């Protein structure tokens, strides 16, 4: 018996992001255990984004032609492989390779899931479904951090202060969790199966510059970039900062979990917030209200105050990602929605390559604390850009702008191969 497509996508997303959250923190500890330093952590973190940056737009084109389901499956399989390589990595070089493959698997899965929502959903449900998908992301992080942290804490019970953290058992547990997501991608019933010929796709294809030239696209990409980069810096460098501040694995895990809990709450409350608060206010606050706490993290060792900061940051970050997804799909040409989402993710990856590498160099000179100051400033600059660019409110997700070619993608049927939805 086949299952409905949307619950399967959300559950697969929950599992894959549980793995992603746990593994990326564990990889930082493993890099240190293999003799690395802040620069090594920066290289490992940057590798996660480098390969996806190269292939992001090609993935979007494949999804726009109807290959979304295959892309989801490939992404989940690569995630399992990457975690197994990380668990067995004998050197920083292998760890960098595992991080790159993990990033590729994640962007395959992410682009496909985000693109299938506007393709297979009624317009009035797009906002809610993006919110539910990102709620799955936050719930996954909420699961991933404590699972990885608990296994690592048990594995390292009795270790002396300053001793390197053993990560192999926790990474193997994460690999098992990743494997649970793979069957879900083969189980659901696609809402529809559409194949678009290369000739049809080429006729309506926009270049990257044309996509970025769409009104509202650049600030949406920048807002998403700063939020996701902030998440990356927090996951990658809080362990390093924690070691220098005397915080153990359990304390760091608790802080990251608090951030995830707050994101779950904000995403669960998003339908109510959208009815009560103007969309522009939510978009601006996503980066404005999170910038100051991010910058202040290195200035205290008080665990209660740090937890409050994580709760504030997590709540507002939880709003930013689904709102920018809806913004991008609304302003994008209908034929190029997956490509536009890929451009958004490519922008995220540019930030994930450049910022961690710069942060690693900065940390090597000034210490890990400066990374959090820089991340906070990026968030505040994004808030200013969003405020200026949304003087006219972003369009509602149900109000899709007409295609520059004058036709909606579902109207181009002459050279498409359509099959009836499976199970009907």
Residue ranges, per PLM feature:
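Juxtamembrane intracellular "pre-TM" segments in multi-pass secondary transporters
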Residues: 1-3, 188-221, 403-418
